[in-house]
Structures are given as C-alpha cells and as structure tokens.
Regions:
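Exported/extracytosolic protein signature
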Residues: 1-143
C-alpha cells in the first residue's frame, strides 16, 4: 500500500500461519462392574453392594508436552470408595502401580500421583508427552 501522507508507511500482510506446538488434553471416565452379591463375578449387575471399578484416562493428542497435569473427580453419589484400590499406569487395562489414598510419599511421583482428599480423587502428572496418556483406576461399593 502506498502511503498517502508524508512520514507514514503501511504494508499489507496476509496469508501467514503460525504453527506453534500445543498440548491437547482430554479426559475420559469409564466404569465396569466387577462383582455383585447375587451374581458374583458372572454377569454382575449395578445393585447395592456391587463393586464397580472406574478408570480416569488423561490423554494428550497434541504436538507439545502438557505440564503440571491435574485431573479431579468428585465421588459424590450413592457409593463408597474402596480403600487401597487406587492404581495408576499408562492405560486402563494395565494400571498396576499402587497408589495410597493420601497426598504424600514417593507414590505421588511414580511417575503419576493420585490421592483421595475428602470426597475428591485427584490424579497428577508432572508432564504428559504428545501422543501419550496416563490412567487412574479405583473401586467403589454401591450403597
């Protein structure tokens, strides 16, 4: 563009795309019934005293590392947390690292942390690389 006043200059810029890597984090929660007091582990139903396992899966589908990842889940509902049932890992099927129920100790950085505070489950990861995930599983008894 040609300036119309002396001392002014202008330039037109278009069609520029900035490609900055970014993290794209998603959270999925799934459940499966492990057993109930009537059917045991054979075709269990969601009835009182059934044991249900939940998995919180946190995934990064972006092109950059996500840092200081925190996922929380409220345990409000007609169920009771099963103490000592928390496990962490890279996916729901293989989450086997034992997590205690408190927010202290070496299990909080192994490489994932998890704890129960009041009625909230919190899962943490210092970082989550592109195309990776971490999972936290825990169990509840239906009231």
């Amino acid at each position: 563009t040609t300036p119309t006043a002396s001392g002014n200059q202008a330039m037109s810029i278009h069609d520029i795309t900035f490609c900055r890597p970014s993290a794209t984090v998603s959270v999925t929660k799934i459940s499966s019934i492990l057993s109930d007091p009537v059917n045991g582990t054979t075709n269990p139903k969601r009835i009182p005293d059934a044991i249900v396992q939940y998995c919180i899966l946190v995934s990064n589908s972006g092109s950059a590392t996500a840092n200081a990842v925190v996922a929380t889940d409220s345990l409000a509902g007609p169920f009771t947390y099963v103490p000592g049932s928390m496990r962490s890992g890279t996916n729901c099927g293989t989450a086997a690292s034992v997590e205690d129920d408190n927010a202290t100790g070496s299990d909080e950085t192994d490489p994932y942390g998890a704890f129960l505070g009041g009625s909230t489950i919190t899962a943490t990861a210092a970082s989550l690389a592109p195309a990776s995930s971490f999972a936290l599983t825990f169990q509840v008894t239906l009231d």
